[in-house]
């Protein structure tokens, strides 16, 4: 799968109409609520426009107040009551609309979060290796929040403003075509201003969203690596780097806010000028009976027209900010899922596993893994493995040693197909691993990593993560194999003790013991122990070793370790250097060769 660079999605919104339409399509999940909301908008707009129209007959009544005072008084009362009723209807429909849109946005946000999380889950490991956790989390936080604000308020207010604007134009045409012609000319000026401010807003808000993600990513990285920062006393340098990106974010936010704050005053001043021009032209052009009512009514609509145009402009600014977040969310959703063209599946019958071939034939899973002339690189033209060949017979323990970057962990990444090779082949019981479905392949592999990740939940739940259908007794037996039962039993609630924040309430060695128990309960025929005992003391390592010996019985095992004691009893030890196997053999054979492995043993050089 090609490298995924999310930076290309941090540009300005390229097609806001398409993004908005795609977002609007999510209203299909709440059609009834949307229908009720649209009816509420129509009722609200009709009430506000009707209330403005009442100014015309009220003005005419004031002009004719000298004749038939009783009749005029009765009309006053009826108009005032009607006006009060319209204002009440406006308030009620506005409240109802807000409630309906809150429910709609909650439903749509649930759907968006589900789709976003599902897309993330279907991405390959390469995707997470190449993108910072903080930057990815910003999609779930700032971008989701911006989109939620768009759905709750921006779209609603924009719909109200546009509907009200159209209704206002209709009433203005009905009152005076000549005055409306003046408004068309003045409106063209407003449209020009709106287009200019909208274009600026798109750039500033996209930049703000991009820098927000950068700050989140940097903070997450520094908080996670705080121990290393303090060990090397780089607090000052970290703070200086943070100040740089934080200053950029502050500058972008200030620019975006400045643009927004300028729009309102500019349009308000324009509306005052247009109001005065319309009033002056109306006095000169309108004559005859009822002219005063027409002018007052028209001016009321001019005010409404100007307000709606101003609101639309401001709402477009908010819309652009929200659309920048929505576009980033959709960019993630549009990423292709991890490719898997495998057709060979894994079948289990008790403790026995078999591969089911496409033709229906069964191949017993024995744990025979072979690499043949494998080449691989994470980045083009920078090879990590070169013409690598090795094999692990069923039940053998294969150990990898070598300096950092030699390719040890890469080999295990290729076995479980976190990455795919560029040339050569990897076979599993004679089957090319690319023919095996990835989930079935990984189900046949148990892994224990040095950087153990534990989920929020009880100790029992974390062990059961290795095989969700495992019983409590099976989890306890696995913990005993990993020599974790003793310390777990002495926790405050034993196996029901809740672990927080990646197992922060356990020591590093205890976390690794839980991870080994998780691998034990999985019953995987092949085990990958990536520096599995490098984070525990010698005594604990010895106890784990005893448990692992029982765990590894009858299984094919790949081991990467810091310490020579971890690999002494391996059937074969592979010494890697710059992506090549430079020595291979068991512990005794390699010592007799007096090569790199011999130097590691006698000079006590670290293996990794």
Predicted regions and their residues:
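Membrane-integrated ABC transporters
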Residues: 1-48, 63-80, 97-101, 105, ...
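Juxtamembrane helix-loop junctions of ABC transporter transmembrane domains
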Residues: 9-12, 16, 39, 47-63, ...
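Transmembrane helices of ABC transporter permease
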Residues: 29-43, 86, 153-207, 277-292, ...
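Helix-loop-helix
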Residues: 64-69, 85, 171-185, 255-328, ...
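Conserved catalytic Walker-motif region of ABC-type ATPase nucleotide-binding domains
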Residues: 120, 242, 329, 371-373
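ABC-type nucleotide-binding domain
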Residues: 350-608
